[in-house]
Amino acid sequence: MVPFWTTVSRNGSSDSETTLQSASKATKQYKYPSLRPSHRLSLLFLFPFHLSANGACFRCTCFSHFKLELRRMGNESYEDAIEALKKLLIEKDDLKDVAAAKVKKITAELQAASSSDSKSFDPVERIKEGFVTFKKEKYETNPALYGELAKGQSPKYMVFACSDSRVCPSHVLDFHPGDAFVVRNIANMVPPFDKVKYAGVGAAIEYAVLHLKVENIVVIGHSACGGIKGLMSFPLDGNNSTDFIEDWVKICLPAKSKVLAESESSAFEDQCGRCEREAVNVSLANLLTYPFVREGVVKGTLALKGGYYDFVNGSFELWELQFGISPVHSI
């Protein structure tokens, strides 16, 4: 048996020294306008047919490699490559009917796979289907709820949660529309009061506390948080490698310092787990730098709570920031 990409004569002899020349000659004979030269050569080298000495028996041994190469070519050149290969295999004298039949079968399989892949995810269709499902199963079945929401909102909670796609607070805590005023960001952090650097967060807190009159602010951390991992990994030399992320997660540097001081010898994963919770406490303390939050806590109209969602083990922890004023002592 000799590989197809070597020169095969009618009497079965081969010349391995002319391998590249033969492949190049074949690719020049059958032009693929939309393929790069490297793809043209790979059509032959990744699709080896083996011939017997008399050229009468064919066996393809590398279909999987060929499939990968076709997918790499992209959608525009796919059909051209298929047609060119069919022409090459069907018209070339050395290839018999069994090879042509085999190619037709492979072609059908590749086309079916390509069609399936191209239809696997349509972002616009996914959004359409999602809204249709929501409207049918929730909106239209709860006219009273959505009728009230059309008049305004009065949520009991303000929630700070991470932007991580795995930890949507409405999903995790089964909140309904109107239950929670939600702010999501990297690592669920609350920065200290700063009208310049953190005006967006300040505006959200001010609106929730003074206008919506929320009764609870909950900061929820979570397991395997990428933001906290970054905080624990980034160097403290001031040389940032990111435009925004490092400056943002440094909000909770006190949490990192506390964890390193208390568990310097622990494994990095354990340190991150401790910091995920400790960063929540830093954010709770930062909330007290907002005058209207502090006033609400002192008056008892506002409670600050910390939470931690472990999606690996399916557990949730909740704790409350205790705040009090010591009695006045006359001296």
Swiss-Prot record:
What processes in GO biological process is this protein linked to?
Answer: carbon utilization
Question: What pathway is it annotated to?
Answer: Photosynthesis; C4 acid pathway
**Tissue expression remark:** Strongly expressed in aerial tissues including leaves, stems, flowers and siliques. Accumulates in mesophyll cells.
Residues bearing PTM Phosphothreonine: T107
Carrying Phosphoserine, the residues are: S170
Catalyzed reactions per annotation: hydrogencarbonate + H(+) = CO2 + H2O
Function field: Reversible hydration of carbon dioxide. This isoform ensures the supply of bicarbonate for pep carboxylase.
Species per Swiss-Prot/TrEMBL record: Arabidopsis thaliana (Mouse-ear cress)
Q: What induces it?
A: Expression reduced by 20% under dark conditions.
Keywords assigned by UniProt? Answer: Acetylation, Chloroplast, Cytoplasm, Lyase, Phosphoprotein, Plastid, S-nitrosylation, Transit peptide, Zinc
- Put simply, this protein is called Beta carbonic anhydrase 2, chloroplastic
The UniProt entry's sequence similarity note says: Belongs to the beta-class carbonic anhydrase family.
Q: Offer a single GO CC term for the protein.
A: cytosol
- As stated in the Swiss-Prot or TrEMBL entry, residues carrying the post-translational modification Phosphotyrosine are Y198
Q: Which residues carry this modification: S-nitrosocysteine?
A: C275
Return the InterPro entries for the record.
Beta_CA_cladeB (IPR045066), Carbonic_anhydrase (IPR001765), Carbonic_anhydrase_CS (IPR015892), Carbonic_anhydrase_sf (IPR036874)
SUPFAM superfamilies annotated for this entry? beta-carbonic anhydrase, cab (SSF53056)
Instruction: Supply one GO molecular-function term.
Output: zinc ion binding
